[in-house]
Amino acid sequence: MKFTNKKKIIIATGGTGGHIFPAYSLAKNFIKNNYAVEIITDERGLKYLDKHNGIKLNLNNSATIFKKNIVNLFLSVFVIFFSYIKSLVILYKANPSVVFGMGGHASFPVCIAAKTLNIPFIIYENNIQIGRSNKYLLPFAFKIFVSYRDLFGIENKHDHKVVVTGNIIREEILNFKKKIIFQRRH
């Protein structure tokens, strides 16, 4: 893709709170800095995010390949493939300058689609052990933002991609802490 929108960011995230809330906090921060932000997530993620106006949400269900049943594994491969195709369409239309993969199986096909379209993607890992989706995406990622320097599961050959950012904390939590501190002093 030649003509990227320098002020647009796509955030791809799995549907659990551990992925969604850092993604939402990151999105709000980018919006404050005049970036257009879109979030791609699955149905679980939409349950958390549907109340948050101002951010364009894209539904893109995916699946995990870590199934014990061969029939479910086979079905998962098809779901992931169709999620990848949908991701290509979303990214082509949005034309972002970068994609953030926040982990979870819903972010995997989006990041692979970004790589296909030559859009750089950054993965974020806030756990001490790299997640499975992020581990498979690591060789293709532009950078990996981590909360802990000594993250388990990242080979030394990827050290040049690692940026220690710490945990992304929701503004509501920071504001709550300020209120508590202020109340205790007075």
Residue ranges and their predicted role:
Residues I20-A23, L49-D50, N69, P109-I112, ...:
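Short glycine-/acidic-enriched loop or helix-start segments at secondary-structure transitions
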Residues I11-Y24:
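A short, glycine/small-residue-rich beta-strand->loop->alpha-helix junction that serves as a flexible
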Residues S25-K28, K32, I112, T116, ...:
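Short, well-ordered alpha-helices that flank and scaffold nucleotide-derived cofactor binding pockets
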Residues R44-Y48, P96-L117:
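An aromatic- and histidine-rich active-site surface loop
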Residues N69-V98, T116:
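An amphipathic, basic-hydrophobic alpha-helix
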Residues R185-H186:
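Conserved donor-binding/catalytic core segment of Leloir-type glycosyltransferases
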Residues N5-K8, A36, R44, K115-K179:
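Active-site-proximal region of nucleotide-activated glycan assembly enzymes
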Residues K6-G14, I31-V79, T165-I169:
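Conserved nucleotide-sugar phosphate-binding/catalytic loop shared by glycosyltransferases and other
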